[in-house]
């Protein structure tokens, strides 16, 4: 390609893995071999004048979560003001969880185009169309405004992870390896199945092996994974455990790393569901992984609330998971979400009892406040509020770090998100 187009990605800690996947998709197409790509941090993004002078067209790509909506609104306005004299050269492109769930609202923030859902196919096609002076508005998987009319070019089929690298090796950018995409569960508070679909897709062990080797050659020997449920790896339906596949994965990686590298499996960002924690899965962690704890999603201590959320597991599953993990000597962090829709005082009391029981068993509680998210069944639900009874019940555990999290900040953000989703106003 001729070097008349440049790409700038807003490469922040929260979104580097997303951009790693997209730049990786560009790298495997020789058409983009000469594409100038700028990885801009929070300072660099305001120092692009030399780039804008040099190229005819510049795509500025920004990914963000709903929790970052207000900061992103400020950012796009600041960029537009600073680079106003270059406006005819710039295309502001948004992608990620919030733009996918709220594309029209994202365009109204000031973006020119939104990439909806998975971008491994859409992103390269879009950049190529821009560079070739073709009508990029015909690219499938995007949305834009035409005289204030919302236009969506249509959803793409789910991508095959094995066709794309998890990160851009040629650009020397590395990170977590995405091993599974999609989620068969339909938790009403979660965007994952709405963004990536309910059909589970796994990266093959051989493909993962290849990229672990590449990292190891560069002395990058802490291996972490991106997956909605670590113990779901290799499962055809995402629900039935495939112990052999999980073992093959971990064993293969351990062979590459030997004793000089570390494998983190079942901790952030690859937590596990409680019903999948059993003697076999825990044994795999003990034999092959380096993490000394598991992060387990409980979300509530009330059967009723779990059913309202469509979680697909029981309170007893949570007890059993903690029991098995602790017996094996693993630490446990259990996620709870407070203020979920339909939660009553009785449900709060039940959750407090469960948390106290789990703490006695040796678990820690990772506390969250329910935040409504676009595209989810709970999008228009009232924002979560942490019942004072919970804080009182946990008052001795908070200073010890046994009950931890940013629930207070989330409570404030949840109010703002709820107002926005109900009114469309920031």
Swiss-Prot record:
The record's section on PROSITE patterns has:
B12_BINDING, RADICAL_SAM
Q: Does the keyword Cell cycle apply?
A: no
What are its E.C. numbers? 2.1.1.-
Q: How is the cofactor bound?
A: Binds 1 [4Fe-4S] cluster. The cluster is coordinated with 3 cysteines and an exchangeable S-adenosyl-L-methionine.
Q: Which cofactor does it need?
A: [4Fe-4S] cluster
The domain of life for this entry's organism is: Archaea
Binding of [4Fe-4S] cluster occurs at: 183, 187, 190
GO BP terms, alphabetized: methylation
Keyword field: 4Fe-4S, Iron, Iron-sulfur, Metal-binding, Methyltransferase, S-adenosyl-L-methionine, Transferase
Instruction: Please state every residue range assigned to the domain named Radical SAM core.
Output: 169-409
Give the family this protein belongs to, as stated in its UniProt record: Belongs to the methyltransferase superfamily.
UniProt name for this protein:
Uncharacterized methyltransferase MJ1487
**Natural source organism:** Methanocaldococcus jannaschii (strain ATCC 43067 / DSM 2661 / JAL-1 / JCM 10045 / NBRC 100440)
**Phylogenetic placement of the source organism:** Archaea, Methanobacteriati, Methanobacteriota, Methanomada group, Methanococci
């Amino acid at each position: 390609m001729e070097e008349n187009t440049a790409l700038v990605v807003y490469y922040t800690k929260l979104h580097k893995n997303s951009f790693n996947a997209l730049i990786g998709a560009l790298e495997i197409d020789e058409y983009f071999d000469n594409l100038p790509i700028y990885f801009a941090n929070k300072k660099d993004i305001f120092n692009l004048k030399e780039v804008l002078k040099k190229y005819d067209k510049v795509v500025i790509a920004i990914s963000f979560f709903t929790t970052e909506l207000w900061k992103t609104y400020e950012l796009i306005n600041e960029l537009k003001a600073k680079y106003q004299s270059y406006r005819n050269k710039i295309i502001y492109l948004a992608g990620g969880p919030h733009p996918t769930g709220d594309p029209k609202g994202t365009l109204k923030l000031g973006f020119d185009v939104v990439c909806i859902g998975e971008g491994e196919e859409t992103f390269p096609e879009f950049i190529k169309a821009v560079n070739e002076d073709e009508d990029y508005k015909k690219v499938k998987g995007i949305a834009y405004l035409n005289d204030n009319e919302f236009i969506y070019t249509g959803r793409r089929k789910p991508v095959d992870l094995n066709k794309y690298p998890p990160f851009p090796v040629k650009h020397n950018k590395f990170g977590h390896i995405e091993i599974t995409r999609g989620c068969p569960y339909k938790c009403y508070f979660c965007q994952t199945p709405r963004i990536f679909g309910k059909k589970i897709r796994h990266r093959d062990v051989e493909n993962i092996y290849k990229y672990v080797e590449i990292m190891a050659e560069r002395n990058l020997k802490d291996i972490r994974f991106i997956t909605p449920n670590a113990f779901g790896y290799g499962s055809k339906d995402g629900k039935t455990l495939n112990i052999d596949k999980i073992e093959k994965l971990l064993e293969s990686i351990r062979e590459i790393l030997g004793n000089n590298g570390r494998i983190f499996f079942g901790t952030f960002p690859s937590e596990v569901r409680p019903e999948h924690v059993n003697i076999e899965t825990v044994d795999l962690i003990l034999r092959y992984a380096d993490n000394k704890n598991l992060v387990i999603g409980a979300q509530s201590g009330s059967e009723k609330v779990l059913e309202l959320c469509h979680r697909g597991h029981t309170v007893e599953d949570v007890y059993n998971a903690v029991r098995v993990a602790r017996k094996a000597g693993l630490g446990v962090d259990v996620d709870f979400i407070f203020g979920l829709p339909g939660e009553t005082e009785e449900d709060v009391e039940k959750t407090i009892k469960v948390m106290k029981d789990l703490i006695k068993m040796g678990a820690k509680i990772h506390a969250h406040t329910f935040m409504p998210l676009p595209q989810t069944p709970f999008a228009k639900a009232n924002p979560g509020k942490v019942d004072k009874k919970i804080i009182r019940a946990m008052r001795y555990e908070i200073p010890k770090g046994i009950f931890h999290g940013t629930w207070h900040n989330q409570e404030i953000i949840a109010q703002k998100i709820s107002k926005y989703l109900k009114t469309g106003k920031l």
